[in-house]
Amino acid sequence: MTQANLSETLFKPRFKHPETSTLVRRFNHGAQPPVQSALDGKTIPHWYRMINRLMWIWRGIDPREILDVQARIVMSDAERTDDDLYDTVIGYRGGNWIYEWAIQAMVWQQKACAEEDPQLSGRHWLHAATLYNIAAYPHLKGDDLAEQAQALSNRAYEEAAQRLPGTMRQMEFTVPGGAPITGFLHMPKGDGPFPTVLMCGGLDAMQTDYYSLYERYFAPRGIAMLTIDMPSVGFSSKWKLTQDSSLLHQHVLKALPNVPWVDHTRVAAFGFRFGANVAVRLAYLESPRLKAVACLGPVVHTLLSDFKCQQQVPEMYLDVLASRLGMHDASDEALRVELNRYSLKVQGLLGRRCPTPMLSGYWKNDPFSPEEDSRLITSSSADGKLLEIPFNPVYRNFDKGLQEITGWIEKRLC
């Protein structure tokens, strides 16, 4: 495989690429309070992006590696879109966020190519894929360099999957009225068909960001994991996010009886952040096809409908929402009106009785997902479970919460 040559071809300078923070042209709120969240990281002065250390470390990145790349970005004296924000260096060069993380990924890519041990090589490929995804973060539409980093991440992920334990199959799903989408089915050792979890990820993540979830939590329990990208990013980039947020996942669910490795009678959905919006919609609209739905830090009502809550959210996250909705130059008022339509309570779903068992995990004082959203989910279910996850120590409690959630899913699938 000529991965290095592909990197050179994709990133070859052709014109002045737009800088990430300029892609969504909203009216800024001005000064914002500091934000810290287990799933989204924290706002740090002089950075446009939220720095999501917990999730990056959870995905296998060494904390020192994160600091090294950040230091290279900070030390750059190249031209920036905003002199006050380190990660706004213009163009694919030293100091640019995408450049520095992609360069770091290429180091691991080279290690993977040089490594003779297949499993270790697979680990290096996975590491490279994760770093390329961080390079592309927060995956805004129209970010040419980020889209090229995503392409490299997908290639590295495919290389990793050929070498790591278990089996991964790349699958194409037909969606009427538009382009087909691609998903990854991760299967544990043994003979299928397997009970399967359909992963519904957050808006600022790619489907390839969840390998750790499969490897540490689902595979040891003999459960397969099926991922697809959220609308408007990655392999689903030709689909815009609409109020029918679960459209793509519904078509995947309906196709599962034709997938021989999946036991379509034992399927659950698991939603992170806005992915919970998708998962809970599935619980209502596709209850005969689902044994259970689990959510973590769900974005299903408050953030979408409460102006005060939206004011507490960092600029980057609002840019992500605007980008997914195709509202790159809309006013904040227009964005608020549109977001309100995505509330599952406003849509008339949440609050109605749902036959599907639903669990929702939350952190107290989470700026993106208050406890009320999780209570709304679990109280709407005929078999609901509310799970509070203490914030500190953040990594240990995150792991403990995931163990409890996957155990709950296993009981309903197996």
From Swiss-Prot:
Reactions mediated catalytically: a carboxylic ester + H2O = an alcohol + a carboxylate + H(+)
InterPro entries tied to this protein: AB_hydrolase_fold (IPR029058), FrsA (IPR043423), FrsA-like (IPR010520), FrsA_esterase (IPR050261)
Keyword Cell inner membrane: no
Enzyme class: hydrolase
Molecular-function GO term, any one: carboxylesterase activity
Domain of life: Bacteria
Keywords: Hydrolase, Serine esterase
Pfam families from the UniProt entry: FrsA-like
UniProt KW Hydrolase keyword: yes
Enzyme Commission number(s) from the entry: 3.1.1.1
SUPFAM superfamilies: alpha/beta-Hydrolases
Protein family (similarity comment): Belongs to the FrsA family.
HAMAP family reported for this sequence: FrsA
Role played: Catalyzes the hydrolysis of esters.
Name of the protein described by the UniProt record: Esterase FrsA
Provenance organism: Shigella sonnei (strain Ss046)
Gene: frsA
